[in-house]
């Protein structure tokens, strides 16, 4: 059996809502809304750019990433390679919205850094996220706390996929309103259905840690 590599973008799905992650990556469900369509158009625009070099920095777009150690793979928007020795690799992720308090976007960036480190035999100390709504670039330190958080999510997301287990909806109802899978997920119905709680209790011993 071929080894499964978890898409790096899936980590952001999990961080936002584990149920959203499972619906997409376990049940293979997907619906597009304005936000996902707008984000897709933004990435298409970024990915279409040609590689270029300016002032000692090479800008590479649509870079394919892969980690055999962590079993993750994906494509990053932009990699800045600072050509002075030792070379510095600086990942940049583009997002349609604005900076967030939560680590959802930073986790995705950190996973990209983990792949770069393995592929290039280097250490990535920081990257950046460009937010289209605010036209701002947020520098993100790839520090120990973010690495630990990212690795925990990789491991837990893998366990959910292997178990074929779809968790309940997030308790944060505000996230549901912007989710493209709201109609498929039906979080309000799930929360009102007492049988769901019964099933959760029935299989409590089998829950994923």
Where are these regions (language model features)?
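Metal-dependent nuclease catalytic cores that hydrolyze phosphodiester bonds in DNA/RNA
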Residues: 1-91, 95, 199-209
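Short amphipathic alpha-helical surface micro-motifs
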Residues: 3-6, 41-46, 61, 110-111, ...
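A diffuse structural propensity rather than consistent per-protein peaks
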Residues: 4-7, 102, 143, 164
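Non-catalytic, well-ordered alpha-helical scaffold segments
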Residues: 8-9, 76, 106-110, 173-177
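Mg2+/Mn2+-dependent nuclease catalytic core
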Residues: 55-156
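Metal-dependent nuclease catalytic regions and adjoining charged, substrate-binding loops involved
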Residues: 68-69, 118-209
């Amino acid at each position: 059996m071929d080894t499964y590599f978890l898409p790096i973008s899936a980590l952001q799905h999990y961080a936002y809502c584990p149920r959203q992650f499972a619906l997409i990556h376990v049940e293979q469900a997907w619906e597009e809304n304005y936000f996902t369509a707008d984000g897709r158009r933004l990435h298409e625009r970024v990915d279409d750019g040609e590689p270029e070099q300016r002032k000692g920095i090479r800008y590479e777009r649509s870079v394919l990433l892969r980690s055999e150690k962590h079993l993750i793979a994906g494509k990053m928007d932009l990699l800045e390679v600072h050509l002075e020795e030792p070379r510095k690799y600086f990942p940049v992720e583009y997002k349609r919205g604005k900076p967030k308090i939560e680590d959802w976007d930073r986790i995705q960036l950190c996973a990209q850094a983990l792949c770069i480190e393995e592929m290039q035999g280097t250490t990535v100390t920081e990257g950046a996220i460009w937010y289209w709504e605010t036209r701002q670039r947020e520098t993100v330190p790839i520090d120990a706390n973010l690495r630990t958080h990212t690795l925990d999510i990789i491991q837990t997301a893998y366990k959910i996929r292997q178990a074929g287990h779809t968790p309940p909806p997030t308790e944060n109802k505000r996230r549901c309103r912007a989710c493209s899978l709201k109609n498929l997920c039906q979080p309000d119905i799930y929360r009102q259905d007492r049988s769901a709680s019964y099933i959760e209790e029935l299989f409590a011993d089998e829950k994923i840690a």
